[in-house]
Amino acid sequence: MTAGRVILVGAGPGDPKLITVRGTEALAEADLVVFDRLASPALLDLAPASAERVYAGKEPGRSAMTQASIDALLVDRARRGAVVVRLKGGDPFVFGRGGEEALACARAGVPCEVVPGVTSAVAAPALAGIPVTHREVARSFAVVTGSTAHGDGVDLAALATATDTLVVLMAAGKLAETCAELIGGGRAVHEPAAIVQWAGTLEQRSVVGTLADLPALAAAVSIGPPATLVVGAVAAMASELAPAAPAGTAIPR
Protein backbone atom coordinates (compact mmCIF):
# COMPACT_ATOMS: atom_id res chain seq x y z
CA MET A 1 0.00 0.00 0.00
CA THR A 2 1.24 3.49 -0.87
CA ALA A 3 2.08 5.53 2.22
CA GLY A 4 -0.52 8.21 2.82
CA ARG A 5 0.01 11.65 4.27
CA VAL A 6 -1.78 14.85 5.22
CA ILE A 7 -1.01 18.25 3.70
CA LEU A 8 -2.36 21.29 5.56
CA VAL A 9 -2.77 23.99 2.91
CA GLY A 10 -3.46 27.66 3.51
CA ALA A 11 -5.83 28.86 0.79
CA GLY A 12 -5.20 32.56 1.38
CA PRO A 13 -7.84 35.28 1.72
CA GLY A 14 -10.77 34.65 -0.59
CA ASP A 15 -9.33 35.14 -4.06
CA PRO A 16 -8.17 31.73 -5.39
CA LYS A 17 -5.31 33.45 -7.21
CA LEU A 18 -3.70 34.20 -3.85
CA ILE A 19 -2.94 30.57 -2.98
CA THR A 20 0.75 29.63 -3.08
CA VAL A 21 2.39 27.59 -5.83
CA ARG A 22 3.00 24.74 -3.39
CA GLY A 23 -0.65 24.89 -2.40
CA THR A 24 -1.73 24.30 -6.00
CA GLU A 25 0.74 21.43 -6.31
CA ALA A 26 -0.65 19.80 -3.18
CA LEU A 27 -4.21 20.02 -4.50
CA ALA A 28 -3.12 18.37 -7.75
CA GLU A 29 -1.85 15.39 -5.73
CA ALA A 30 -4.96 14.98 -3.58
CA ASP A 31 -7.04 11.85 -3.19
CA LEU A 32 -9.22 13.65 -0.65
CA VAL A 33 -9.76 17.37 -0.04
CA VAL A 34 -11.27 18.40 3.29
CA PHE A 35 -12.17 22.06 2.88
CA ASP A 36 -13.42 24.94 4.99
CA ARG A 37 -16.09 27.60 4.46
CA LEU A 38 -13.59 30.38 3.74
CA ALA A 39 -11.57 28.49 1.13
CA SER A 40 -12.67 29.48 -2.37
CA PRO A 41 -14.67 26.69 -4.05
CA ALA A 42 -12.74 27.46 -7.24
CA LEU A 43 -9.68 25.87 -5.65
CA LEU A 44 -11.43 22.50 -5.57
CA ASP A 45 -11.14 22.45 -9.36
CA LEU A 46 -7.37 22.16 -8.95
CA ALA A 47 -7.77 18.69 -7.44
CA PRO A 48 -8.17 15.67 -9.72
CA ALA A 49 -11.75 14.93 -10.79
CA SER A 50 -11.41 11.58 -9.02
CA ALA A 51 -10.53 13.19 -5.69
CA GLU A 52 -13.16 13.06 -2.97
CA ARG A 53 -14.28 16.40 -1.56
CA VAL A 54 -15.56 16.73 2.01
CA TYR A 55 -16.94 19.97 3.45
CA ALA A 56 -15.87 20.66 7.02
CA GLY A 57 -16.79 24.31 7.35
CA LYS A 58 -17.51 26.13 10.59
CA GLU A 59 -19.49 29.30 11.11
CA PRO A 60 -21.00 31.01 14.15
CA GLY A 61 -23.43 28.64 15.82
CA ARG A 62 -22.94 25.62 13.61
CA SER A 63 -20.30 23.30 12.18
CA ALA A 64 -20.44 20.74 9.40
CA MET A 65 -18.08 18.50 11.42
CA THR A 66 -16.64 18.57 14.91
CA GLN A 67 -12.92 19.16 15.24
CA ALA A 68 -12.49 15.65 16.64
CA SER A 69 -14.25 14.21 13.59
CA ILE A 70 -12.01 16.18 11.25
CA ASP A 71 -8.87 15.00 13.05
CA ALA A 72 -10.06 11.39 12.90
CA LEU A 73 -10.89 11.64 9.18
CA LEU A 74 -7.47 13.02 8.29
CA VAL A 75 -5.66 10.33 10.23
CA ASP A 76 -7.87 7.46 9.06
CA ARG A 77 -7.67 8.25 5.37
CA ALA A 78 -3.93 8.90 5.44
CA ARG A 79 -3.36 5.60 7.23
CA ARG A 80 -5.28 3.93 4.41
CA GLY A 81 -2.85 5.36 1.86
CA ALA A 82 -4.56 8.56 0.71
CA VAL A 83 -2.97 11.93 0.08
CA VAL A 84 -5.27 14.11 2.18
CA VAL A 85 -5.29 17.86 1.59
CA ARG A 86 -6.79 19.90 4.41
CA LEU A 87 -7.68 23.20 2.73
CA LYS A 88 -8.11 26.16 5.06
CA GLY A 89 -8.82 29.83 4.45
CA GLY A 90 -5.91 32.15 5.19
CA ASP A 91 -3.03 30.44 6.96
CA PRO A 92 -3.64 27.13 8.76
CA PHE A 93 -1.57 28.16 11.77
CA VAL A 94 -3.23 31.57 12.33
CA PHE A 95 -6.47 30.88 14.23
CA GLY A 96 -7.17 28.02 11.84
CA ARG A 97 -6.78 25.10 14.25
CA GLY A 98 -4.06 23.78 11.98
CA GLY A 99 -1.84 23.17 14.97
CA GLU A 100 -4.44 20.82 16.46
CA GLU A 101 -4.67 18.87 13.22
CA ALA A 102 -0.90 18.69 12.83
CA LEU A 103 -0.62 17.38 16.40
CA ALA A 104 -3.30 14.77 15.75
CA CYS A 105 -1.28 13.53 12.78
CA ALA A 106 2.01 13.57 14.67
CA ARG A 107 0.56 11.63 17.59
CA ALA A 108 -0.91 9.07 15.20
CA GLY A 109 2.38 8.67 13.34
CA VAL A 110 0.94 10.15 10.12
CA PRO A 111 3.28 12.32 7.99
CA CYS A 112 2.01 15.89 7.81
CA GLU A 113 3.25 18.76 5.65
CA VAL A 114 2.27 22.35 6.34
CA VAL A 115 1.87 24.75 3.41
CA PRO A 116 1.60 28.29 4.79
CA GLY A 117 -0.99 30.63 3.29
CA VAL A 118 -1.44 34.38 3.04
CA THR A 119 -3.16 35.26 6.30
CA SER A 120 -6.20 37.51 6.23
CA ALA A 121 -4.71 39.31 9.24
CA VAL A 122 -2.47 41.16 6.80
CA ALA A 123 -4.24 40.58 3.48
CA ALA A 124 -7.70 41.84 4.46
CA PRO A 125 -6.38 45.24 5.56
CA ALA A 126 -4.07 45.41 2.52
CA LEU A 127 -6.89 44.66 0.09
CA ALA A 128 -8.84 47.53 1.67
CA GLY A 129 -5.92 49.93 1.31
CA ILE A 130 -4.62 49.63 4.87
CA PRO A 131 -0.98 48.68 5.59
CA VAL A 132 -0.66 47.20 9.07
CA THR A 133 2.69 48.98 9.48
CA HIS A 134 3.81 52.29 8.02
CA ARG A 135 6.98 54.26 8.63
CA GLU A 136 6.58 56.86 11.39
CA VAL A 137 2.94 55.85 11.86
CA ALA A 138 2.87 52.22 12.99
CA ARG A 139 5.95 50.21 13.86
CA SER A 140 4.16 47.27 15.45
CA PHE A 141 1.00 45.25 15.05
CA ALA A 142 -0.75 42.48 16.93
CA VAL A 143 -3.33 39.95 15.79
CA VAL A 144 -6.05 38.49 18.00
CA THR A 145 -9.28 36.61 17.47
CA GLY A 146 -12.68 38.03 18.22
CA SER A 147 -14.22 34.57 18.52
CA THR A 148 -13.25 31.72 20.82
CA ALA A 149 -14.68 28.25 21.26
CA HIS A 150 -15.27 28.50 25.00
CA GLY A 151 -15.88 32.21 25.52
CA ASP A 152 -12.44 32.75 27.07
CA GLY A 153 -11.60 35.81 24.98
CA VAL A 154 -8.47 37.93 24.76
CA ASP A 155 -7.93 40.60 27.42
CA LEU A 156 -8.27 43.47 24.96
CA ALA A 157 -8.09 46.13 27.65
CA ALA A 158 -4.61 44.91 28.60
CA LEU A 159 -3.52 44.78 24.96
CA ALA A 160 -5.14 48.06 23.93
CA THR A 161 -2.09 50.32 24.17
CA ALA A 162 0.60 47.67 23.74
CA THR A 163 0.75 47.91 19.94
CA ASP A 164 0.34 50.54 17.25
CA THR A 165 -2.01 48.54 15.01
CA LEU A 166 -4.41 45.93 16.32
CA VAL A 167 -6.03 43.43 13.96
CA VAL A 168 -9.00 41.43 15.20
CA LEU A 169 -10.06 38.44 13.11
CA MET A 170 -13.65 37.16 13.20
CA ALA A 171 -14.61 40.55 14.56
CA ALA A 172 -18.17 41.12 13.34
CA GLY A 173 -20.07 39.29 16.06
CA LYS A 174 -18.71 41.35 18.95
CA LEU A 175 -17.71 44.57 17.22
CA ALA A 176 -19.40 46.94 19.66
CA GLU A 177 -18.02 45.10 22.69
CA THR A 178 -14.53 44.99 21.19
CA CYS A 179 -14.44 48.71 20.44
CA ALA A 180 -15.76 49.54 23.90
CA GLU A 181 -13.17 47.33 25.57
CA LEU A 182 -10.34 48.94 23.60
CA ILE A 183 -11.55 52.40 24.57
CA GLY A 184 -11.76 51.24 28.18
CA GLY A 185 -8.18 50.01 27.92
CA GLY A 186 -6.88 53.39 26.80
CA ARG A 187 -7.30 53.67 23.02
CA ALA A 188 -8.66 57.06 21.98
CA VAL A 189 -12.35 57.23 21.10
CA HIS A 190 -11.47 59.08 17.89
CA GLU A 191 -8.77 56.63 16.81
CA PRO A 192 -9.22 55.46 13.21
CA ALA A 193 -10.71 52.00 12.82
CA ALA A 194 -11.97 49.96 9.89
CA ILE A 195 -13.77 46.69 9.33
CA VAL A 196 -13.37 44.63 6.14
CA GLN A 197 -15.88 41.96 5.14
CA TRP A 198 -15.31 39.16 2.60
CA ALA A 199 -11.78 40.35 1.78
CA GLY A 200 -10.44 39.14 -1.55
CA THR A 201 -13.85 38.49 -3.10
CA LEU A 202 -16.16 40.48 -5.34
CA GLU A 203 -18.35 40.96 -2.27
CA GLN A 204 -15.61 42.73 -0.33
CA ARG A 205 -16.87 45.73 1.62
CA SER A 206 -15.16 47.97 4.13
CA VAL A 207 -16.27 50.67 6.52
CA VAL A 208 -13.89 53.23 8.02
CA GLY A 209 -14.62 55.35 11.06
CA THR A 210 -13.42 55.71 14.62
CA LEU A 211 -13.51 53.35 17.56
CA ALA A 212 -16.50 55.30 18.85
CA ASP A 213 -18.64 55.28 15.71
CA LEU A 214 -17.52 52.20 13.77
CA PRO A 215 -20.06 49.78 15.34
CA ALA A 216 -22.97 51.99 14.29
CA LEU A 217 -21.52 52.61 10.83
CA ALA A 218 -20.99 48.88 10.28
CA ALA A 219 -24.47 48.02 11.54
CA ALA A 220 -26.02 50.59 9.20
CA VAL A 221 -24.76 48.65 6.17
CA SER A 222 -25.18 45.18 7.73
CA ILE A 223 -21.51 44.22 7.91
CA GLY A 224 -21.33 40.62 9.12
CA PRO A 225 -18.99 37.62 9.15
CA PRO A 226 -16.40 37.02 7.92
CA ALA A 227 -14.89 40.36 8.83
CA THR A 228 -11.56 41.74 10.02
CA LEU A 229 -11.23 44.77 12.30
CA VAL A 230 -8.21 47.09 12.04
CA VAL A 231 -7.56 49.65 14.76
CA GLY A 232 -4.86 52.30 14.54
CA ALA A 233 -3.74 55.37 12.62
CA VAL A 234 -3.09 53.26 9.52
CA ALA A 235 -6.83 52.65 9.12
CA ALA A 236 -7.22 56.25 7.95
CA MET A 237 -4.98 55.50 4.97
CA ALA A 238 -7.85 53.60 3.36
CA SER A 239 -9.26 56.94 2.21
CA GLU A 240 -6.29 57.31 -0.14
CA LEU A 241 -5.31 53.71 -0.89
CA ALA A 242 -8.54 51.72 -1.05
CA PRO A 243 -9.30 50.31 -4.52
CA ALA A 244 -12.25 51.79 -6.38
CA ALA A 245 -13.80 48.34 -6.68
CA PRO A 246 -13.09 44.94 -5.09
CA ALA A 247 -10.45 42.93 -6.93
CA GLY A 248 -11.30 39.33 -6.21
CA THR A 249 -13.47 36.38 -7.03
CA ALA A 250 -17.10 35.71 -6.22
CA ILE A 251 -17.54 32.97 -3.63
CA PRO A 252 -20.83 31.05 -3.89
CA ARG A 253 -22.63 30.62 -0.56
What are these regions (language model features)?
Residues 1-16, 21-115, 214-215, 224-227:
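Class I S-adenosyl-L-methionine
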Residues 3-8, 79-84, 97, 140, ...:
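A contiguous loop/helix-start segment that scaffolds small-molecule binding in enzyme catalytic cores
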Residues 21-24, 42-44, 74, 131-133, ...:
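Short, flexible, glycine/charge-rich loop motifs used to bind or transfer phosphoryl groups or to couple energy/partner
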Residues 35, 88, 116, 145, ...:
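Short beta-strand/turn micro-motifs composed of small residues
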Residues 43-44, 105, 124-125, 178, ...:
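Hydrophobic packing residues within well-ordered alpha-helices of enzyme cores
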Residues 51-58, 109-113, 132-142, 186-195:
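Short hydrophobic/aromatic-enriched beta-strand-loop microsegments
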Residues 91-162, 205-208, 253:
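Class I SAM-dependent methyltransferase SAM-binding "motif I" and its flanking Rossmann-like core
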